[in-house]
Amino acid sequence: MKNISLIITTNMRNNFRSKTAIIIWYGTALLILVALAALFGILLIAPELNKVSPDRVKLELYLGIIMFSAATLGLGINLNALGFTSMIREKSRGNIQSILATPVRLKDIWIGKSLAIFIPGLIQGGLLTLISLIAVNYIYFVPKVGFVFNPWIAVTSFFAIPLIYFCLGLLVYLIGLTGKPVNANIIAQAFLPVYINIIIQMLIRTTIFDASSWTFTLINTGLALVIAILVIILQFRLTKERVALSY
């Protein structure tokens, strides 16, 4: 555990050295979220609030989509911004090979480096989600229908989505360590837009999902479980020989 903590601290410090890139990526996440919230406000929330009796279930759905997007963007853009850059830098400089020569377990290296990417994303995703909850309520809901909140929205946004990205981070770093970082990057870069687009489309266009229900939380937790199973299956690849030969 001590080795993992040291790896996390060191890698987080290294990851945030390129402040310009970090500002650009995090700024992008914030701009996308603001644009999405404004779009939902104009096209969906405002028309519903202008009705004589606004449908609170629909308002919870729209709030759930915005909070889901905030959590996913915060965690996803963080993984996209830091994961690939970190792996490329470490492999090109031979940092991983240097660590392999020490008594530190390879599994500790993998978990520590994955957590060094995940923790900043968890903080960013949590903050964006909390800001979205408060901002959407006080800009749109409170003046007309009061504070809108559903516990399942919170569980999905603060637990299920981070769990997905924790497992995805382990998978991405496992593939990056034992193979080519570009392959890991493809997974990370493709997952965010595909996942968020499919979920939003299904929430808006169908009645299969409801962002404010326990089933939505269960579906996202199930996705995290699927990714976790993939990680367990692929763990056999994590050997010093394979990591060394992947350069």
Task: Name what the model sees in each region.
Residues 13, 17, 85-89, 107-124, ...:
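Alpha-helical transmembrane segments of multi-pass membrane proteins
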